[in-house]
């Protein structure tokens, strides 16, 4: 099959979170199964690996009521069957830092930026004579793709393509004032609540994807069920229940080449199931990197976007009580100012027990996964989550709240590979930490937990085959 994959970020070129990881890994998994895959994404100003980009000799010209937009299509060949294409436009992407916003908030023209991506990706496929069987859009930034496919490309070479829309996080919906309908030349008959883009008198890009796509997926089976409830449906649960027969929960995989303790260039010592001794070396190096003394105390780590969703406020609430025990806590992340400040204040208050790095540091993130004994993920909700799977691969026991993809990947109980807690409450998290301390006091049992986690297969191969089966079913309809 020919698969066109459209995403607002693609690792390693651009990334703010899990979407970038998926957009980098799933197309590669599909290509390895023998499919021809092209990924289309913006050419941002701060693109990593920009030196790899080559001109295709083709360019876009899109006409909107606010003006004409044009720009070249650039290419980075990843493998024989996988190519990443970049849509360049100085006015929308090249004139600013950041993907979606800056310190002042979301960019005011995001509706224009991602309309250009959505429509431009389809035009780019035509210009490059790539005729997809499947067009796979992701999150609100590409929600207009299936709309454009039905309303602007319903004749011609893309007419028979099937559309798939993946919800990576339902909370982010891309809502804009209704006057963007005119700004983007969207037909007003689409501004309806039942089967259109209208949502509480706004234009909702995510809803557009949910309504107009041939199939919907989300990133774990549990999350697919959760988003059909009023508690986690963010106002779209009724629509999702209506389209439940088209909704599939497919668990994300992880990049097993990048995240492999047996061959991780970021680690001072490698290790695996047959020999875990290198993990102790990583623990010593981790403590040294944070200026903490080596010793017998267990190390609890986290690598996270510092956000309400991730439960970092709950962690801040619980840690002072947890630090009465002889433990170490180290973390890497950035995000909401009050959470950053709270973690730095905690580090100042407990300088011998807490180490915090504010910012994105891939090497340090790998070292936390390898060197920590336990990994903290107290998420309010978690569509899939990746770090708990990294932790399991690295023999680091995850402590997670029982929600979303965390339920689908972490096994609790005496014969499990992790520790789960139900209630989003300080007492529940502290109880989970106490269970971790009891586990740490029993080295043979801790070793069993580690090994059970390391034996799990979270490769993209399994996820890729699930998507492949879905794509085949769609094409056969």
Curated annotation (Swiss-Prot):
Enzyme class per UniProt: transferase
The reaction(s) this protein catalyses: [(1->4)-alpha-D-glucosyl](n) + ADP-alpha-D-glucose = [(1->4)-alpha-D-glucosyl](n+1) + ADP + H(+)
Assigned EC number: 2.4.1.21
InterPro entries, A to Z: Glyco_trans_1 (IPR001296), GS/SS (IPR011835), Starch_synth_cat_dom (IPR013534)
GO molecular function: alpha-1,4-glucan glucosyltransferase (ADP-glucose donor) activity; alpha-1,4-glucan glucosyltransferase (UDP-glucose donor) activity
SUPFAM superfamilies: UDP-Glycosyltransferase/glycogen phosphorylase (SSF53756)
Pfam families per the UniProt record, alphabetical: Glyco_transf_5, Glycos_transf_1
Residues bound to ADP-alpha-D-glucose: 15
Any single Gene Ontology cellular-component annotation: cytosol
Pathway: Glycan biosynthesis; glycogen biosynthesis
Transmembrane segments: none
Protein keywords: Glycogen biosynthesis, Glycosyltransferase, Transferase
Biological process according to GO: glycogen biosynthetic process
Highest rank taxon of the organism: Bacteria
The family this protein is said to belong to: Belongs to the glycosyltransferase 1 family. Bacterial/plant glycogen synthase subfamily.
Record PANTHER family: ALPHA AMYLASE DOMAIN-CONTAINING PROTEIN, GRANULE-BOUND STARCH SYNTHASE 1, CHLOROPLASTIC/AMYLOPLASTIC
Function: Synthesizes alpha-1,4-glucan chains using ADP-glucose.
Protein name: Glycogen synthase
Species of provenance: Myxococcus xanthus (strain DK1622)
């Amino acid at each position: 099959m020919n698969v066109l994959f459209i995403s607002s970020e693609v690792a390693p070129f651009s990334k703010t979170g899990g979407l970038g990881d998926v957009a980098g890994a799933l197309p590669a998994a599909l290509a390895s199964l023998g499919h021809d895959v092209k990924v289309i994404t913006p050419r941002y100003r701060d693109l990593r690996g920009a030196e790899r980009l080559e001109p295709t000799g083709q360019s876009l010209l899109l006409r909107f009521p606010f003006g004409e937009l044009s720009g070249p299509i650039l290419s980075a060949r990843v493998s024989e069957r996988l190519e990443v294409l970049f849509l360049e436009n100085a006015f929308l992407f090249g004139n600013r830092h950041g993907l979606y916003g800056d310190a002042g908030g979301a960019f005011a023209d995001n509706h224009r930026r991602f309309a250009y991506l959505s429509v431009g990706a389809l035009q780019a496929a035509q210009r490059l004579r790539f005729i997809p069987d499947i067009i796979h859009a992701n999150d609100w930034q590409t929600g207009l793709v299936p709309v454009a496919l039905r309303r602007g490309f319903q004749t011609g070479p893309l007419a028979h393509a099937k559309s798939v829309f993946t919800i990576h996080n339902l909370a982010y919906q891309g809502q804009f004032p209704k006057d963007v309908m005119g700004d983007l030349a969207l037909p007003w008959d689409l501004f309806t609540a039942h089967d259109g883009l209208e949502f509480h008198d706004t234009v909702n890009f995510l809803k557009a994807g949910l309504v107009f796509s041939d199939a919907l997926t989300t990133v774990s089976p549990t999350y697919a069920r959760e988003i059909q409830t009023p508690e986690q449906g963010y106002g779209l649960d009724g629509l999702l229940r209506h389209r439940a027969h088209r909704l599939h929960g497919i668990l994300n995989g992880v990049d097993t080449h990048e995240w492999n303790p047996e061959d991780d260039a970021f680690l001072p010592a490698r290790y695996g199931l047959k020999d875990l001794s290198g993990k102790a070396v990583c623990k010593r190096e981790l403590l040294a990197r944070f200026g903490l003394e080596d010793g017998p105390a267990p190390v609890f780590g986290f690598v996270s976007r510092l956000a309400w969703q991730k439960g970092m406020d709950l962690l801040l609430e619980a840690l002072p009580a947890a630090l009465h025990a002889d433990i170490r806590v180290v973390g890497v992340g950035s995000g909401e100012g009050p959470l950053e400040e709270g973690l730095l204040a905690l580090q100042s208050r407990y300088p011998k027990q807490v180490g915090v790095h504010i910012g994105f540091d891939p090497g340090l993130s790998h070292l936390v996964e390898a060197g920590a004994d336990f990994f903290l993920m107290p998420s309010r909700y978690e569509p899939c989550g990746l770090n708990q799977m990294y932790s399991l691969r690295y023999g680091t026991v995850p402590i997670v709240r029982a929600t979303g993809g965390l339920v689908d990947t972490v096994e609790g109980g005496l014969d499990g590979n992790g520790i789960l807690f139900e209630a989003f409450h300080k007492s529940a998290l502290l109880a989970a930490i106490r269970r971790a301390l009891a586990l740490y006091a029993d080295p043979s049992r801790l070793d069993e937990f580690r090994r059970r986690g390391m034996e799990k297969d979270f490769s993209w191969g399994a996820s890729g085959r699930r998507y492949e089966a879905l794509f085949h079913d769609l094409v056969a309809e």
